[in-house]
Amino acid sequence: VYQETEKWISYEITLDVFGPEVFAWGILTVPKDIRQGEKRPVVVCQHGLEGLPFDVVETDSTQRNYQVYKGFAARLAERGYITFAPHNPYRGQDKFRVIQRKANPIGLTLFSVIISQHQRIVEWLQGLSFTDAEKIAFYGISYGGKTAMRVPAVVKGYCLSVCSADFNEWVRKVATTEHAFGYVYTGEYDMPEWDLGH
């Protein structure tokens, strides 16, 4: 048990994806009022860049991660949804970008791993006795929103996707060298995903 309130209980979960080397992990939050035999919808709640699954279930308003995410996975659980907050490997400043750079020449990306992780997560969620396998949604914030625009389009089992805070002026941000808000002037050199906005 990771955390428990009057309305829900959460668990830290680890799932094998490709043996023990590549795995998926996150926080499953389950409302306490689920009746025997009842199946509830699930919302997969994705953190952003440098985030962790714990960030989206944080309910202490004095914590910085609450200021960013407002505990949206916990709030959804309070409203009766099952939530799963997975970890995505876009952490460690430049470390995940090195993996991305190494993957590109062999025709892969960081999302090649993330997609495999999410396929396993969805399969697992669909197999739980208290989840509605036809109602698994995806909600991502910031880099999680980037994930929301890519993963549910490929992974079978998501019924809808919400992208929050990762969609405005995208082509201009990626392609510009004339404006200071362009990614070319940041440490996020992995952003120019050419032809994505075409």
Question: Where in the sequence are the language-model features?
Answer:
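Glycine-rich nucleophile elbow surrounding the catalytic serine of serine-hydrolase chemistry
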Residues: 140-152
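Cap/lid segment of the alpha/beta-hydrolase catalytic domain
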Residues: 35-127, 172-179
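Conserved hydrolase catalytic core segment
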Residues: 153-159
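N-terminal cap/lid segment of alpha/beta-hydrolase-fold proteins
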Residues: 1-38
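Alpha/beta-hydrolase-fold catalytic nucleophile elbow
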Residues: 47, 87, 139, 164-165
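Alpha/beta-hydrolase fold nucleophile elbow
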Residues: 130-142
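Mobile cap/lid helix-loop segments that gate and shape the active-site cleft of serine hydrolases
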Residues: 113, 160-198
